[in-house]
């Protein structure tokens, strides 16, 4: 079992640590190399909860397909229940990666976490 890893985004090598661990985790949970899909969860109107929709917008602007949740069409507490059947279907064909902000204690502020688990 892969345990969570926390990465301080202020570290100079944070991007390298994140990408190395993401690659490891994807190889572990997606050994057959299924295409990726992204569930970018959050509220576009709440600054502390907009990481998911913001990342979804950036991913779509870079031409990635199978991105669910953008600033224009957020995947949040109101829309997620309606979209769960779609995401369950997507999960059968794709390796689904969830991107979401989390509110934690002040010591966790600015940290990224990678965790294997269900949506």
Language-model-detected regions and their locations in the chain:
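N-terminal catalytic or cofactor-binding beta/alpha core of small enzyme domains
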Residues: 1-119
